[in-house]
Design a protein with these regions (language model features):
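Long, intrinsically disordered low-complexity tandem-repeat segments
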Residues: 20-42
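Bacterial N-terminal signal peptides
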Residues: 3-12
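N-terminal module-boundary/linker segments of secreted carbohydrate-active enzymes
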Residues: 40-122
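Boundary at the C-terminal end of the N-terminal hydrophobic targeting segment
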Residues: 15-17
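Active-site acidic/histidine clusters and adjacent loop/turn architecture
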Residues: 109-174
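Active-site-adjacent loop/helix surface patches within enzyme catalytic domains
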Residues: 156-200, 206-211
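Catalytic cores and adjacent binding grooves of peptidoglycan-active enzymes
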Residues: 50-65, 186-193, 198-274
C-alpha cells in the first residue's frame, strides 16, 4: 500500500509517507510528512500533521465527509489519507439515509454485514471529489485498494454518492453517471435478489457503460435509454470501460468478474465478486 500512497501524493502534489498495520479490516495507522528540497541537494522533512493552509470551509467538508463535493489538493496537505480511503461499520447517520430506500423493508441483509466506504476520486475536470459507497464487508478492503490506485492514477469517475440520494432508483442513479454498490433489489423481471442486494456488485460510471442486450431478431435493449450512444463499444469516449481500462484490470486482479464479458447480455458498468 505504501507505493500506492506515494503515487497518490505525486498526483496531489505533496509528499506523504504511509505505513500500514493489519489490525482489522477497518483499522490503519499512518504518518504524514512534507519534504522540502534544499539548495545543497539534500532534503528536509517536517511534520505537517497540524498544518492547515487552506480555507476552513473545505476542511469542514472533508471532516464531515460531504460526499459529492470537491476539494482542492491543498485541503489534503497534512491530512491523514487513511481517513480518505477507509471502510467502517455503517454509522447511524448513514443508515438513517438508507432506510426505506436502498435498505428497504424486508431487506434480508444485515447491517452488520455491510460497510461504509470512503474514497477520494478525480472527475474528468481534474477536480478531487469525495466519494462514498456501501458494500459487503467481504469486498470492502478490495474497494479501498482499487480506488486508492485509481485515484493515484487520476482515473476519472464523475460521481460517487449513495444511491439513496436518488431514492434508490437505479435508472436515476445511472442517468446521473453515479457509481454505486449496495441496493437491495431484484434482478429486473424476477424475484431473484441482485448481487447489489448483498453489496457485492458495483456499477462504475454507468451512463457511459450501459447494460446492453441484443435479441434474436436483432433488436437492442439499452439501459439507461439515455446511454444509447455509448452502446457501440467500437467508439472511443470518456469513462469507457474495456479490457484495456485500468479499473477493469484492478477489479479483475482481485477476483471480480466483469459484466462486459457476459455472453447473452453485456453490463459494461458492472463488476461483482461472489
Amino acid at each position: 500500500m505504501a507505493a500506492t500512497a506515494v503515487a497518490i501524493c505525486l498526483a496531489t502534489g505533496f509528499a506523504y509517507a504511509k505505513q500500514t498495520t493489519n489490525l482489522t479490516d477497518d483499522a490503519r495507522q499512518a504518518t504524514s510528512v512534507e519534504t522540502t528540497n534544499l539548495t545543497d541537494g539534500s532534503q528536509q522533512k517536517a511534520s505537517v500533521t497540524e498544518k492547515d493552509p487552506r480555507p476552513g470551509g473545505e476542511r469542514t467538508v472533508l471532516k464531515n465527509w460531504e460526499a459529492g463535493k470537491t476539494i482542492s489538493s491543498l485541503t489534503l496537505r497534512g491530512y491523514d489519507l487513511n481517513k480518505c480511503f477507509m471502510s467502517e461499520p455503517i454509522p447511524n447517520r448513514v443508515f438513517e439515509r438508507m432506510q426505506g430506500k436502498s435498505y428497504k423493508k424486508g431487506c434480508t441483509v444485515s447491517r452488520e454485514s455491510l460497510r461504509y466506504v470512503k474514497v477520494l476520486h478525480w472527475n474528468d475536470k481534474g477536480k478531487i471529489c469525495l466519494g462514498e459507497l456501501v458494500c459487503h464487508k467481504s469486498i470492502a478492503n478490495d474497494l479501498v485498494e482499487i480506488f486508492e490506485t485509481l485515484f493515484a492514477k487520476k482515473y476519472p469517475i464523475e460521481r460517487m454518492v449513495l444511491i439513496d440520494n436518488y431514492g434508490a432508483d437505479d435508472l436515476k442513479s445511472m442517468e446521473a453517471n453515479n457509481t454505486s454498490c449496495f441496493n437491495f433489489r431484484y434482478v429486473a423481471g424476477t424475484k431473484v435478489p441482485s448481487n447489489h442486494s448483498y453489496g457485492k456488485a458495483i456499477d462504475l460510471n454507468p451512463l457511459y457503460n450501459p447494460y446492453v442486450r441484443k435479441a434474436a431478431n436483432g433488436k437492442k435493449t439499452v439501459s439507461p435509454l439515455s446511454a444509447q450512444r455509448y452502446a457501440d463499444r467500437s467508439k472511443d469516449f470518456k469513462y469507457k470501460i474495456d479490457r484495456n481500462d485500468l479499473a477493469y484490470k484492478e477489479f479483475r486482479k482481485r477476483g471480480f468478474t466483469w459484466g462486459g464479458s457476459w455472453k447473452r447480455s453485456q453490463d459494461y458498468q458492472h463488476f461483482e465478486k461472489k
